[in-house]
Design a protein with these regions (language model features):
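Rossmann-like AdoMet
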Residues: 1-130
């Protein structure tokens, strides 16, 4: 068995995979977005700056923000959306957030949480190739 296949099974096997069987709220590790909203706020500020550099006629009707590997919390997307909603209403209006996570249960949890907070803004799919 190649390492790639072993890792695929270890992480995503439907019955034994780490990301498909562990849905508890106590993670084994934390990433930068889980420490607080600071990374998301910084990214949102930079997105706002980039948005304002575009001439109005060049600003896209739909601006897609994609978080790959969002997990069950989608903390990064949440803090970006909160910041844009408060500080960049023009960009927020045109924005759609797409959450990607291969674990469908985790993706469903994230979509449920963010869809309630940001109606009609958050979408999801388990496969990056589907975007």
């Amino acid at each position: 068995m190649e390492f790639r296949d072993w890792m695929e099974d270890a992480l995503y096997d439907k019955e034994r995979g780490y990301y498909t069987t562990r849905l508890d709220s106590i993670p084994d590790y934390v990433t930068a977005p889980n420490f607080g909203p600071y990374l998301g706020q910084t990214i949102a500020r930079e997105l706002g700056r980039a948005w304002h550099l575009l001439p109005t006629h060049a600003q896209p009707q739909v601006f897609s923000l994609v978080e790959v590997g969002c997990g069950s919390q989608a903390s990064l997307t949440r803090s970006i959306l909160e910041t844009l909603q408060a500080n960049e209403p023009g960009l927020y209006c045109n924005l759609q957030a797409i959450l990607v996570d291969r674990s469908v249960p985790r993706l469903s949890q994230a979509l449920d949480k963010l869809s309630r907070a940001f109606p009609n803004k958050v979408f999801g799919c388990p496969d990056m190739a589907q975007i």
